[in-house]
Amino acid sequence: MKKLKSFGGKNLGGKSMNQLQKLQEEMQKKLQEVEEGFSNVEVDVSVGGGAIKIFATADRKVKDIEIDEDLLEDTETLNDLLIAGINELMEKIEKIREEEMAKITQNFLPF
């Protein structure tokens, strides 16, 4: 088992503290770029057989909701479908975000 040193600027896993700091800064910059790019990633869901469509971006901003006029009279169903649709949309967004973040962090792992 390889010992990792972290005192006095000595090596940590084969990299100096300066190299690790630069790597961390580079990773933070890349993560911020990806975070900013999420505003350009469009995500949508359709629930109730297409009666409700919700559109958002991966930065968690809802952009539009389309509701079939027939649902406007049945507020209970409308409410249930909106909740289901928003939850499904958020799950989709989180999956996209996790996959993109994993790609970034995987490239920076020292081992």
From Swiss-Prot:
| Any one Gene Ontology molecular-function term assigned to this protein's record | DNA binding
Q: Where in the cell is it found?
A: Cytoplasm, Nucleoid
For this protein, the record's InterPro entries field holds: YbaB-like_sf, YbaB/EbfC
Q: Which UniProt keywords apply?
A: Cytoplasm, DNA-binding
Q: Name one GO cellular component term.
A: cytosol
Quote the Pfam families the UniProt record gives: YbaB_DNA_bd
Q: Which family does it belong to?
A: Belongs to the YbaB/EbfC family.
* Role noted for this protein: Binds to DNA and alters its conformation. May be involved in regulation of gene expression, nucleoid organization and DNA protection.
Known partners and oligomeric status: Homodimer.
- State the name under which the record lists this protein: Nucleoid-associated protein Tmel_0542
What taxonomic classification does the UniProt entry list for its organism? Bacteria, Thermotogati, Thermotogota, Thermotogae, Thermotogales
